[in-house]
């Protein structure tokens, strides 16, 4: 475009001359017409193609590598220097942690400007011919810097109009042990990611680009180097949008009403302090104000020790739980659990615990728990806020009256146990719209595990319960904490850190989402202080009124 315009008089002439001196060209081998046609033919036929200057592969989805993209090393050094002088901003949420520059669209630095022209004029024209896609001149390019423990978890890059993603690496000597690889996932019959089948190692002046599609799932693995940064320029070429397949919805997790259970289970398992009427009233008041509470030393010490011993013995059958664009952790197979762990799972599903939780939180989780019609004059109306204390959004609720706390320890649970049939309860609870239900699992958390917020996350009113085991020496900087955020926002409302024998209760509304932050390699420090530890466990349950 500049070549078609007459030179401006005055000081503009040296500037244009300067720009001509800083120019970028990509590999002559790639621009050869014969090679370009061969790559275009392979792209069109969806067949692999390999040449010393360029490699195209279809497994697990279409991607291409040009090992020496820019011709001039002097240009690359100048570009590298300009990039490091930029202001970087920390990017942090459930999906990623790294540093990113401002958009490079309007930067005036000579090397950055020259690269931008190369990518979105010369290379875009070449890529349009190769791919057969009418790529638009839209500029979308930024610089990313990944340092120790930074990562970008599994995602597909799909956004309206994105057709081809690219990454130009400007890293020093690099190998797989340093992490930071571009990992590519294969997919199942539902077009959901399964496992990593290919990893591309960054190297100086390597360009990787791939077709953005419903199956282009990839991640940047955690950077493991404490000395070296992983610097890259990345962006997208835009064009006509592809038609997306119908959204896949996972089968819903079964929910069940409480299990009829003698109230003695509470006295057998739970710290007696939490069965005291006055203390329950105090807890309920705090919970209704904050919508969250952490109850320390929740289980009796001897019971907690039995649970930890069973978990440490290794007799539990663990199964990896995905898909990785939504979650990655291990879940216990309940059919083969040791007896004490089965009993603990039964505790959290028991009628007695439903009633105890009703009295600790003021929620209607049992037909004996007071409803709004039973509201007492002493207590009046109470507010249940959203997940974080101090937020103004929330749902108005009515707490239990003090006179109802005599059932806190489940003293009336047994005599009503026979009425716990789901159908009977449903009839009883029509005015409440549903029978109280729960779902739960026993999870193991290790380095690399996480959960993500995703587009199909169902948001509803619910009480989250977590009981943590094996957290000795666990630090917040390791990750593994549960973070609550408002829908559409990255700012954290509440963080629940794993803590031994602590029961976390959090009430969330329809505008509140949660995730477990990626557990990074700093977590390996735990095993140095506690050799028998390589992560932690939690009993995770959700209760619905």
From Swiss-Prot:
Protein name: Prolyl 3-hydroxylase OGFOD1
Biological function: Prolyl 3-hydroxylase that catalyzes 3-hydroxylation of 'Pro-62' of small ribosomal subunit uS12 (RPS23), thereby regulating protein translation termination efficiency. Involved in stress granule formation.
Biased amino acid composition, Low complexity: 383-393
Species name: Mus musculus (Mouse)
Subunit structure: Monomer.
Family statement drawn from the similarity comment of this UniProt entry: Belongs to the TPA1 family.
UniProt cofactor(s): Fe(2+); L-ascorbate
Biased composition (Polar residues): 402-417
Sequence positions that bind 2-oxoglutarate: 169, 230
UniProt-annotated stretches for the region Disordered: 1-23, 371-437
GO cellular component: cytoplasmic stress granule; cytosol; nucleoplasm
Ranges of residues in domain Fe2OG dioxygenase: 137-239
GO biological process: cell population proliferation; protein hydroxylation; regulation of translational termination; stress granule assembly
A Pfam family the protein falls into: 2OG-FeII_Oxy_4
Annotated EC: 1.14.11.-
Reactions mediated catalytically: [ribosomal protein uS12]-L-proline + 2-oxoglutarate + O2 = [ribosomal protein uS12]-(3S)-3-hydroxy-L-proline + succinate + CO2
Cofactor note as given: Binds 1 Fe(2+) ion per subunit.
């Amino acid at each position: 475009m500049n070549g078609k315009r007459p030179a401006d008089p005055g000081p503009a002439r040296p500037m244009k001359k300067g720009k001509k001196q800083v120019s970028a060209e990509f590999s002559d081998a790639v621009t050869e017409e014969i090679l370009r046609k061969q790559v275009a033919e392979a792209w069109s036929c969806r067949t692999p193609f390999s040449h010393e200057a360029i490699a195209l592969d279809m497994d697990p989805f279409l991607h291409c590598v040009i090992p020496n993209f820019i011709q001039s090393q002097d240009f690359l050094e100048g570009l590298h220097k300009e990039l490091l002088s930029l202001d970087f901003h920390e990017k942090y949420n459930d999906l990623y942690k790294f540093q990113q520059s401002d958009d490079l669209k309007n930067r005036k630095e000579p090397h950055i400007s020259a690269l931008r022209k190369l990518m979105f004029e010369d290379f875009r024209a070449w890529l349009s011919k190769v791919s057969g896609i009418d790529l638009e001149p839209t500029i979308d390019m930024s610089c990313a810097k990944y340092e120790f423990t930074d990562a970008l978890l599994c995602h597909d890059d799909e956004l309206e109009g994105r057709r081809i993603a690219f990454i130009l690496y400007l890293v020093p000597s690099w190998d797989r042990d340093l992490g930071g690889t571009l990992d590519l996932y294969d997919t199942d019959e539902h077009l959901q990611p399964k496992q990593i089948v290919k990893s591309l190692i960054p190297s100086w002046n390597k360009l990787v680009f791939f077709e953005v599609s419903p199956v282009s799932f990839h991640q940047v693995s955690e950077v493991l180097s404490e000395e070296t940064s992983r610097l890259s320029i990345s962006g997208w070429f835009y064009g006509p949008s592809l038609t997306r397949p119908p959204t896949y919805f996972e089968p819903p997790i079964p929910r069940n009403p409480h299990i009829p259970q003698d109230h003695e289970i509470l006295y057998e398992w739970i710290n007696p302090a939490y069965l005291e009427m006055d203390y329950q009233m105090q807890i309920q008041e705090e919970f209704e104000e904050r919508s969250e509470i952490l109850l320390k030393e929740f289980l009796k010490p001897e019971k907690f020790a039995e649970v930890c011993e069973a978990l440490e013995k290794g007799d539990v059958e663990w199964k990896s739980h995905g898909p990785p664009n939504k979650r990655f952790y291990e879940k216990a197979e309940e059919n083969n659990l040791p007896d004490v762990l089965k009993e603990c799972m039964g505790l959290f599903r028991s009628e007695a615990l439903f009633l105890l939780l009703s009295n600790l939180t003021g929620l209607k989780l049992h037909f004996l728990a007071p409803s709004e019609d039973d509201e007492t004059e002493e207590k009046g109306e109470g507010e249940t806020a959203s997940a974080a204390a101090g937020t103004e959004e929330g749902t108005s609720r009515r707490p239990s009256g003090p006179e109802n706390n005599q059932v806190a320890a489940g003293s009336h649970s047994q005599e009503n146990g026979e009425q716990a049939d789901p159908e009977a309860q449903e009839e009883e609870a029509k005015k409440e719209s549903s029978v109280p239900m729960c779902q739960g699992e026993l999870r193991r958390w290790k380095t690399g595990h996480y959960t993500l917020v995703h587009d199909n996350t169902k948001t509803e009113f619910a009480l989250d319960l977590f009981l943590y085991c094996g957290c000795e020496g666990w630090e917040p900087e390791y990750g593994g904490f549960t973070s609550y955020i408002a829908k559409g926002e990255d700012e954290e409302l509440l963080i629940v850190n794993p803590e031994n024998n602590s029961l976390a209760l959090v009430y969330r509304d329809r505008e509140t989402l949660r995730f477990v932050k990626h557990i990074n390699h700093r977590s390996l420090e735990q095993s140095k202080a506690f050799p028998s530890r390589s992560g932690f466990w939690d009993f995770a349950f959700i209760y619905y009124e």
